[in-house]
Amino acid sequence: MHRLRGCCARPRGAPLRAERSRASSRALRVLVDMDGVLADFEGGFLRKFRARFPDLPFVALEDRRGFWVSEQYGRLQPGLSEKAISIWESKDFFFELEPLPGAVEAVKQMANLQNTDVFICTSPIKMFKYCPYEKYAWVEKHFGPDFLEQIVLTRDKTVISADLLIDDRPDITGAEPHPSWEHILFTSCHNYHLQLQPPRRRLHSWADDWKAILDSKRLR
């Protein structure tokens, strides 16, 4: 995420298919964000915030607005922004996040599709003592060691070339003003209220028809 601000990859026993996919000019490249798309950043943050600061006010998930958790907490009460940040800067925060429902299964299926290259594209926080390592450990835990080759760590996703980026952040900007990918907004508690203007599209959850979104790019 939020917040900070994400594999798939070659399944065991299928290295030849993956190599052919990468070599094919028809391969569809999909970037999948991690926090808020694969891992439940919002739920994990709220649980740990309330456990550490039980007497302080908090923002319920249904009241979340805006991508940046720390900004909304800062408006709630002076000093809460720093306390919020301390949660995700703590050891084991990223590693202990639970997968979002259906995320692991969907991305594994996606990685097995013919002519499809899938990468987790995630932005580590600037306080890097724990975050980068824990992101790799999380992927290994939930996807297996082969998926580690499919991780892209970057603070600027606009410079990564792909056909699709599935990400819960509504506004993704960076050095490249015209990224190669189409941004599919993954619905989260902080963005569900936003009205997207066509041709922008959403993926409401991993139970939604993500295959249709991929197929729509193949037809172009």
Curated annotation (Swiss-Prot):
Keyword Lipid biosynthesis listed? The answer is: no
EC annotation from Swiss-Prot or TrEMBL? 3.1.3.-
What range does the transit peptide cover?
1-23
Enzyme class (EC, first level):
hydrolase
Quaternary state and partners of this protein?
A: Homodimer.
Recorded hits in PANTHER family, A to Z, give: 5'(3')-DEOXYRIBONUCLEOTIDASE, 5'(3')-DEOXYRIBONUCLEOTIDASE, MITOCHONDRIAL
Name the record gives this protein: 5'(3')-deoxyribonucleotidase, mitochondrial
- Tell me what organism the protein belongs to: Mus musculus
